[in-house]
Amino acid sequence: MKLLHIDSSILGDHSVSRQLTAAIIARLQEVTPDLDVSHRDLAANPLSHLSGALLAASAPGAPAPDPSTQAALGESAAILAEFLAADIVVVGAPMYNFAISSQLKAWIDRLVIAGKTFRYADGAVEGLAGGRRLIIASSRGGVFEAGAAAAALDYQETYLRAIFGFIGIADVEIIRAEGLAFGEDARALAIKQAGDAILRLEAA
């Protein structure tokens, strides 16, 4: 069974989402024998954002692109293939300014491809990337869960549920540590609660 481990935090060793993804991987390795893990660090090795040249070169029947665009096409194809080959995907997704990091968005933009991970049929959208398990390690300084005063400002988890649901992954598991900026006690409690949730993860 293949697992794709994605980190996107820019905080390195100070990152809570990285701490959570590492713990999730350790837990899944414990309950799933022979797990084949691949790791992609989107902060250490960021992807370029989509460009007009890349989109034009991706169109059916497009003329041969210049060498740099051809390299970007190859990288995008490899990103998508890596995702589609995974049975389990673990994504570290810190909240930045109420949303996800631009590094993570650039990766997602390589996945949401018409004819590959979704299609339009009979006037509706059909996701084509179902059948894989998705676990998101969410970290945020404030409190944005349902019912919280700031819940309407959550464009992080809500976006991730929506975009992965769009491509067919409706059951998204979220391990959350929030309120991290509310003092050391609140931070420690949030991390402990997330750790407890990780220990309850079962094999796929």
From Swiss-Prot:
Query: Residues of the signal sequence?
Result: none
- Flavoprotein is among the record's keywords: yes
| EC number(s) per entry | 1.6.5.-, 1.7.1.17
Question: Into which EC class is this enzyme placed?
Answer: oxidoreductase
Keywords associated with the record: Flavoprotein, FMN, NAD, Oxidoreductase
Q: Does the keyword Flavoprotein apply?
A: yes
Q: How is the cofactor bound?
A: Binds 1 FMN per subunit.
Residue sites binding FMN per the record: S9, S15, V16, S17, M95, Y96, N97, F98, S139, R140, G141, G142
Stored InterPro entries: Flavodoxin_fold, Flavoprotein-like_sf, FMN-dep_NADH:Q_OxRdtase_AzoR1, NADH:quinone_OxRdtase_FMN_depd
Q: What's its catalytic activity?
A: 2 a quinone + NADH + H(+) = 2 a 1,4-benzosemiquinone + NAD(+); N,N-dimethyl-1,4-phenylenediamine + anthranilate + 2 NAD(+) = 2-(4-dimethylaminophenyl)diazenylbenzoate + 2 NADH + 2 H(+)
Q: Name one GO molecular function term.
A: oxidoreductase activity, acting on NAD(P)H as acceptor
Gene3D superfamilies, per the entry: 3.40.50.360
Per its UniProt record, the required cofactor names are:
FMN
Under the heading Pfam families, the entry gives: Flavodoxin_2
Quote the function comment for this protein: Quinone reductase that provides resistance to thiol-specific stress caused by electrophilic quinones.
> Quaternary structure?
Homodimer.
UniProt family annotation: Belongs to the azoreductase type 1 family.
Q: What is this protein called?
A: FMN-dependent NADH:quinone oxidoreductase
Originating gene: azoR
